[in-house]
Regions:
Chain A
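Short, solvent-exposed mixed-charge patches
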Residues: 142-144
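Alpha-helical segments in soluble extracytoplasmic regions
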Residues: 28-106, 121-138
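Amphipathic, charged alpha-helical scaffolds that flank and support histidine-based chemistry
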Residues: 108-122
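C-terminal region of N-terminal signal peptides and the immediate post-cleavage residues
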Residues: 16-33
Length: 144, 406, 119
C-alpha cells in the first residue's frame, strides 16, 4: 500500500513539470518575455561596463556570448511553439524582441573593448528591455 | 603573540575556505529572486556548519578520530557503507561542480575553450598539491578567498536600506515551493559537509591535540561567522542590483557583475579572483575529502603529509576522483546544474554523517571532560532535527520546482 | 580484566582502526573471533573478504561475488589476540604490519602500488 502511494506521488512529481506542454499559453509567453527582459537588463549592465571602460574585455565578450546564446534559444523556443490565436500578436512581438536582443549581444561580443559601441548597445538594451516590459504589462494586463 | 598570529591565520583560512560554488550559485539566485528575504537561511546554515565543524574538530583533537573513523565505529560496516557511498557520490559531484566552476571563471578571465581550462585546472590542482605542504595549500586558497571581501565592500557601496536587510534575518516561510527550494538550497550550500570532513582530517594531519581545542573553537566560531558575512554579502548585492530588474543569474559570470558595477574593472577582477580561489580551494578540499573518507572507512594508510609513497592507495584514489570529475564536467553538463544537484544531495546524505559525530562528541567515555556541554548538546540536537527535515523535503522540492527552474 | 570486559571490548573493538608498532595504519577490525565459554576474544579478523558477512543477508551473495572467495592469509587475515598491545582510539599491535601480512594494499610490493607513477 505504502509503496503504491509512494509510486503515485513520484509519478505525479515527475509529470508535473511537463504538464504545461502543448500550445503556448499566455502564462508561458509571459514567462518567456520576462526572461527576455531579465537578459536585456543583464546586457545593459555589461554594456554599461564596456561604455565606461570599467570592465575586462574578455569578461564582457564571454558574458555576451553566453547571454546571447540564451536569447537566441528563447527566440527559437518562442518561434517554434504553436501559440493560441488570442496571443498570436504578442508572440510575434516577443520573437522580434528576442531577435533584437540576440543581435545586440552579438554586437557586444564583437566590440567588447569599444566604449562607443558599448554605449550604443547599452542604450539599445534599455530600449529592448522597455519593449519587453511593455509586452509583459500587455500580457498580464489583459489576462482575465 | 605567536599564538594569536597562529589563531588569526587559522581563522582567515576558515573564512576564505567557507565559500564555494554552491554558495555563489544559490546565494546569488536567492538574492535575485527574493531580495533579502533569505538572509535568515544563510545565518541558519552558517551556525549549523559552525556547530558541526566545532564538534568534528573537537572529536578529532581529543580522540584522534577523523569523521569516517567515527562513522564506521558508531554505525558499523553496513550502515556506514551507505554513508560512505552517499558521501562519495556527493563529493564526486561537488568536485565536478567546483572544477567546472573554476574552468568557467578562467574562461571569463582568459577567453579560451572551456574544456581546455577544465583539463588545465585539474593539472594545476595536482601540481599545487604535489608541490605545497598541507598547511600551505589551505592557506594559499584561504587567503586568496579573502578577495571575496570585495562583495562586502560592494554591499556598503550600494548602501541598501539596512532596515530591509535586517528584516531579512527574521525567518519567514511561504507556501511557494520555489521559495522553500531556495531555503533548502541556501542552508545546504552553507552546510556542505565535505568542508568539515576535510578540516577534521586536516586537524589530525597537522597533529592537533587537546591543546588545540581553543584554536578549533575560534576557527569554527569566528572563521565561519566571518564566512557567513561573505555569504550574506552575496545575497545582499544580488538582491540590491538584480532583484528590481528581474535578472536571473543562471551562470557564474553574473555573480561578479555587481562588483563591476560598483568598482569597475578592479572590482570585477577582485571578484573573479576571489571566486577562483574559493572554487579552486573547494575543488581540492572536496576531492581530498572523498579520498579521506574512503581510506578512513577501509582502514588504509592516509594523509597528504604521509606522501604518495607511504599512502599510495589514498593518493591514487584522490587522483581517480579528480579524473572522474574531469570526465563528468567534460560530458557537457552545465556546472551550475551539477552544483544544484551536489548541494541538494549533500543535505540528503548529511544526517548519516552528522549523527555519529554528535553521538561521539557527547559520549564521555570517548571525550572525557571535553564531551558536549549543555549548550553544545542542545545546539547539536536542534541542528540534527533541522538537517533531518531538510533531508526529507530536499528531493521532493527539487522535483517539484524542476531544480529551481520553475 | 573482569568478566564484563569481553562484551565491552567487543563493542570498542569491532570496526576500529589497526595500527602496527610503527604507527602505520594497516586495516580495520572487520570481524572478531570468539572461542570458549564464556566466549573470549581469540583473534582479530581483517580483510576485504570479510566485508560480505557484515552486510544484510540479502546483499551477501552479491557482495561475495564482488569481493571474491575468502582466502585465509591473503584477503582474510587472522591476527591472534596475543599480538594486540594496547587499545585506545585505535588497536595497537606489537609487531610490524608486513610481518602479519597487514596493509598489503599500501605495500610497495603490491602489484597495483608498483605500477603507480611515483613508485
Amino acid at each position: 500500500m505504502a509503496r503504491r502511494v509512494a509510486a503515485a506521488i513520484l509519478a505525479a512529481a515527475l509529470l508535473l513539470p511537463t504538464a504545461g506542454c502543448g500550445d503556448l499559453s499566455r502564462d508561458e509567453l509571459n514567462r518567456g518575455v520576462e526572461s527576455l527582459s531579465a537578459l536585456a537588463a543583464q546586457g545593459e549592465l555589461i554594456a554599461s561596463g564596456v561604455a565606461r571602460d570599467a570592465t575586462k574585455a574578455t569578461y564582457a565578450r564571454v558574458m555576451a556570448k553566453t547571454l546571447g546564446g540564451q536569447a537566441e534559444h528563447e527566440a527559437e523556443k518562442l518561434a517554434d511553439a504553436e501559440s493560441s490565436p488570442e496571443v498570436k500578436e504578442e508572440r510575434n512581438a516577443a520573437v522580434q524582441v528576442a531577435g533584437e536582443l540576440a543581435d545586440l549581444f552579438s554586437e557586444l561580443q564583437t566590440f567588447a573593448g569599444d566604449e562607443h559601441h558599448g554605449a550604443l548597445v547599452q542604450k539599445h538594451m534599455g530600449e529592448v528591455k522597455e519593449q519587453a516590459d511593455a509586452l509583459v504589462v500587455r500580457l498580464s494586463g489583459e489576462a482575465p | 603573540m605567536k599564538a594569536i598570529l597562529k589563531v588569526a591565520l587559522g581563522v582567515i583560512a576558515a573564512l576564505g575556505g567557507f565559500l564555494d560554488i554552491g554558495d555563489l550559485v544559490f546565494n546569488t539566485q536567492a538574492g535575485a529572486l527574493y531580495r533579502y528575504d533569505l538572509l535568515w537561511a544563510v545565518a541558519l546554515g552558517t551556525i549549523g556548519i559552525a556547530v558541526y565543524a566545532e564538534m568534528c574538530g573537537r572529536v578529532a583533537a581529543v580522540t584522534q578520530r577523523p569523521v569516517f573513523d567515527s562513522i564506521r565505529m558508531r554505525l558499523g560496516f553496513g550502515t556506514g557503507l551507505v554513508a560512505l557511498v552517499a558521501s562519495t557520490a556527493v563529493n564526486l559531484l561537488t568536485v565536478a561542480a567546483e572544477l567546472g566552476g573554476l574552468a568557467i571563471i578562467l574562461t571569463l578571465l582568459f577567453d579560451a575553450a572551456f574544456s581546455l581550462f577544465v583539463v588545465l585546472a585539474a593539472i594545476g590542482l595536482v601540481v599545487a598539491v604535489a608541490l605545497l605542504p598541507f598547511g600551505g595549500i589551505e592557506r594559499i586558497f584561504g587567503y586568496g578567498g579573502l578577495l571575496m571581501l570585495v562583495f562586502v565592500a560592494v554591499a556598503f557601496h550600494q548602501s541598501p536600506d539596512w532596515g530591509d536587510v535586517a528584516h531579512g534575518f527574521v525567518p519567514s516561510l511561504s507556501s511557494s515551493t520555489l521559495y522553500l527550494y531556495f531555503v533548502v538550497g541556501v542552508v545546504a550550500a552553507a552546510l556542505m559537509p565535505y568542508e568539515v570532513h576535510f578540516s577534521s582530517s586536516g586537524a589530525i594531519e597537522e597533529g592537533w591535540t587537546e591543546k588545540s581545542l581553543k584554536e578549533n573553537r575560534l576557527n569554527a566560531i569566528v572563521g565561519y561567522a566571518l564566512g557567513g558575512i561573505l555569504a550574506c554579502a552575496l545575497v545582499i548585492v544580488s538582491g540590491y542590483l538584480f532583484h528590481p530588474i528581474g535578472v536571473d543569474p543562471g551562470d557564474l559570470g553574473t555573480v561578479a557583475l555587481p562588483a563591476q558595477g560598483a568598482f569597475g574593472e578592479t572590482g570585477l577582477l577582485l571578484a573573479l579572483g576571489g571566486m577562483m580561489f574559493c572554487v579552486g580551494g573547494a575543488a581540492i578540499d572536496s576531492s581530498f575529502s572523498a579520498a579521506y573518507n574512503l581510506a578512513q572507512f577501509l582502514g588504509w594508510e592516509w594523509g597528504r603529509n604521509r606522501g604518495p609513497k607511504k599512502a599510495p592507495r589514498f593518493t591514487a584514489s584522490w587522483l581517480v576522483f579528480l579524473f572522474l570529475a574531469v570526465l563528468i564536467v567534460l560530458s557537457g553538463i552545465n556546472p551550475v546544474e551539477i552544483t544544484e544537484y551536489a548541494v541538494i544531495f549533500a543535505v540528503v546524505a548529511l544526517p548519516l554523517t552528522y549523527l555519529p559525530i554528535l553521538l561521539i562528541a557527547g559520549d564521555r567515555s570517548f571525550m572525557g571532560g571535553h564531551a558536549n556541554g549543555r549548550l553544545s548538546a542542545a545546539l547539536g540536537w536542534i541542528y540534527f532535527a533541522v538537517i533531518v527535515v531538510l533531508a526529507i523535503v530536499a528531493i521532493p522540492l527539487l522535483l517539484m520546482t524542476n531544480a529551481g527552474g520553475g | 580484566m573482569n568478566r564484563e570486559e569481553p562484551i565491552f571490548v567487543a563493542h570498542r573493538l569491532l570496526d576500529e582502526q589497526i595500527l602496527d608498532c610503527d604507527g602505520k595504519r594497516c586495516g580495520r577490525v572487520d570481524d572478531i573471533e570468539l572461542q570458549g565459554s564464556p566466549p573470549r576474544v581469540t583473534a582479530l579478523l581483517v580483510g576485504e573478504a570479510l566485508y560480505p558477512r557484515r552486510l544484510p543477508r540479502r546483499l551477501r551473495g552479491l557482495a561475495r561475488r564482488i569481493a571474491g572467495p575468502e582466502t585465509w592469509g591473503s584477503n582474510a587475515l587472522r591476527i591472534p589476540w596475543e599480538e594486540v598491545d594496547e587499545i585506545n582510539a585505535a588497536v595497537h599491535l606489537r609487531g610490524k604490519a608486513e610481518e602479519l601480512g597487514l596493509g598489503y594494499g599500501d605495500d610497495p610490493e603490491n602489484w597495483l602500488v608498483r605500477r603507480l607513477p611515483w613508485n
